[in-house]
Amino acid sequence: MAIKNTLTGSGLLVLLTLACGTTVQSSPPTPAPRMYPNMNERPLSAESRLTPGTYRSELHIDLKSPQKTASQSSLAPTGDNNSKVESIIAGSDTTPRSAEGTSESPPVPQLGTPPRPAPRRSKGEGERQPPTAAPRTSRSVDTGSGSDASTEQQAGGQKVVTPIPASKGIYPSLDELRRSQESNVDAGSGTSTNEGGGTSEGPQVPQSGIPPRTGRRRAKARNRKRHPTPASRESSSEDENQPPTTASRPSNGEGESQPPTAAPRTSRSVDTGSGSDASTEQQAGGQKVVTPIPASKGIYPNLDELRQTQEGEESAPQPADVTWFSMSVPMGVVDRRVSRALKEQFFQFLQHLSADYPKQVQTVYEFLGWVADKLPENEEEVQMFIDALNTTEAMVGKAARWIFKAIPERERETIYSSFYQMFRDKLPKKFFETAEGMNPDVGQYFSAEEPVAVTPEIPAKSEEDSEAAETPTPLRRQANVAAQVLHPLPAKGVTRREWIPWPKMQNAISKAHGPLTRVPEWTPVTGSCALGDGYTDIDVTKATTDVLFRITLLILQQIRRKKTERGKLEDDQALVALCSAAGAFVDAWQHQQQALILEDPGTPKAHAQLIERLRNAGKYFMKSYDETTGESDHQQWKKNKAEVSKLGKSALMKSCVKYIKASGDVATRPFDSGTAKYPSRSLYGGIANTLETPFADSEAVAKAVHDYAKEHKKPEKLVGLCGALQISGYFKKCFSDAGRLSSVSFFHQHVDGASVLVRTLARERPIGRHALSQAICDPNISAQYFEGAFRLFSSTVSQEWEKENLFAQLASWTGKEMVLAPSLEEQAAVPPAQPAYETVYGDEEDRIYRIHVSGRHSSPQEVLYVGGIPSTVKPQQVHVLGPTVSDESRRMIHPVRHRSRTAPSSEAASTAAESSDEDPLPAENATAFLGVTPQEEESDAYKHTLDFDAVSPRKNKNKENRISAPLKQSDTLIEESTSKTSEL
């Protein structure tokens, strides 16, 4: 139907409004107000605030039953005027667009009324009508009637629900929606749809660019009128009973706050209550649409089985650790990396052991009942092998006699008798015969007449493990526990570790004499070694922790004897020697254990552990009872502990710790290459790294000692260096007669420090400025104290500790006096310091510089000393006699061109001596060390001058004393005399 209207001003305005969907105003142009979801948020324009006739209206649609009309009423106006717009659209072939910005509301069809054209509006009404928002569409579910999903369209606060079929995807297809709506009309559902996707009961929402078909819409309206459904009758009756009211503001629950263009949201849910399958949940405009979907067949379990299990066990709640998956694991879970690394390490150890001690390895295998090619499979078997190795060493080794005597007599019968009764049928008879040959005293416990103990032998775990391996077990709670490790089955008849006697021996010796980690390996030492009287062996495998435990008790006892109220450690050079020797001794011992691959190189430094034990002596004190006898005196123990704690915090102990640290730092000084630091592996290496000088020449070492003394002003640094040097010399003496591989290793790990100090003192210059450092660094004064300290500390690694029962005497902390080192008992006063002069005479111990081809001397940093340098780089005109030690404080001697023909005289030398700040030497002594052979002057002889450039370190560096003494020499080099060469 075409709209008949004259193209006048008002008619043209209406036509443009219907076609374009926008409000066209003539004069004056007024901007159209913007629509907002909330009308209270819409700002008013300037014109609307000034003009009282501006209205703000919204559409309200009431659906009436048949024979009724749908009315449209506006909201209350903002001004004084009221306007009510009513439009009845029935069968109009032109439908206005309901887009944002239009001034007309969407048409609503009227049931039971013949179609008639919509009334035209006046120009004023069209200008005052604000644009309305497009109807919103959402999806909802009618759970009450059990119908399918539906489409919900909303306009002006009224909702129209249209059933839609379940879609295959997330969003429904329009074709399926249209076909479903048409089928509902044919079945008498009372609801019809148009091709544009809208319904006849709700506002028309035509598709863009497609005009609606009014003829089909009328036919569907008539069919719905003729065949109403019960649902439509019920809704119609409800609408008749409700009077028409104005549209209320939309609430958040109705989805009015959602913007028109918001996309529907989709999620997945499971209806566990009704037992249905999983579903797809679509949400649009605040409503949810649930579409059933089939259960998945992927990696996830079937939800129906899980739901049925939960429904069947509702009465009994499931525990938290219930798992739904289990599998049979006959062999368990094996961590092959651990077993592989264990086998590789043990195989290397066994190779070395088999090469050095093949008979001992064979005895161990017989002891354990293993075949010749068997290797331990787990850590327990490795420990069994080590215990068996220690047992054979304790029974038939060189330490068998010592171990037998170290075990308390009341425990010997239990250990040796039980061992014989347990293994006399498993070990060959030759084993027990060898044990009796090494230690005849043990034969009394190897008596065949004694009946074997009726102790039932514990069966091996082979049967139990095999049964457990065949039974499949579910892997439950695999996320919270580590992987199960399947230990290989032990060999048949393997002796358990509890039956091996070595742990019992170790425990018995530790109770009586302190901790014992390994079986001793007694190595003979030379007669010049500073050991106790009658002792000639050292246990080279003694653990560092055992040595630290014993030395701690020794130092506490010595400080306790010398502790006074006002005494100072620096006043007793014997105690200073003891403390400085302790740090070097324990570090050197740790280096030796690491060289034998008995300890890990990454362990903490030994001197640091010793300091920590001494500072916290109260925490490391003995137990309140005697482990050997079981007797206890708690009151005495509490008193002793308080005294030891007080001694550990005393000033004397703090001073001792200072010197322990100084010598320990020297022993562990790493080598700094500039880019990396390499730790020292021996006491010899630590001393060389501290001096930063190779020990290829004693002259260089002597110079480095003096340089080190100048660099460090405090005496403890120099005391630590000298203490490490002297202790290293005593170690070298002990292992100089190398009879074993361990002795050879220890010999090369040390240096004869006493010889180095003597060579340094050959210049008749003391080392350092302090009286204490001069006394400690002089072997002629302090050698006796360092020898006593070494003798005291060596008792911890010799048989003297067990024979003299030192552990019981030191741990009891009684008032009984113990004289362990006679040379350390009396207080040794420190002699006064000697003046540490630095001569500036060029004719005494001078530095020798390298002479370039051009005759220039090199920089003072490139110093060459006399010992060991080739004659081609030595100054040939200068003959230096006596010990020469290069020193930065010495004068420089180099040949230059002559400046005068005046011969050298004693006055020049005396003038040079007077320029020095030290006591000058006589003139005749000034030239005593400088031998120059005068010769007759020749015609074309070169003239040389001997310059003495003296700069005293105690004076200003800019002040120089320069004396020239020309000498007559030939152009040929003066040959050195035989007598002078012999003196060099």
From Swiss-Prot:
Indicate the secretion signal residues.
Answer: 1-26
Which UniProt keyword terms apply here? Glycoprotein, Membrane, Repeat, Secreted, Signal
**Mostly located where?**
secreted
Please list the residue ranges that the record marks as compositionally biased, kind Low complexity.
902-914
Give the positions annotated as glycosylation sites.
Answer: N81, N390, N780, N925
Q: Name one GO cellular component term.
A: membrane
Q: Where is the composition biased (Polar residues)?
A: 66-85, 92-105, 135-156, 242-285, 967-984
> At which residues are the sequence repeats?
129-172, 258-301
Q: Where is the composition biased (Pro residues)?
A: 106-117
Ranges of biased composition (kind: Basic residues): 214-228, 892-901
> Where is the segment annotated Disordered?
24-300, 882-984
Q: Which named protein is this?
A: Rhoptry neck protein 4
Q: Which gene encodes it?
A: RON4
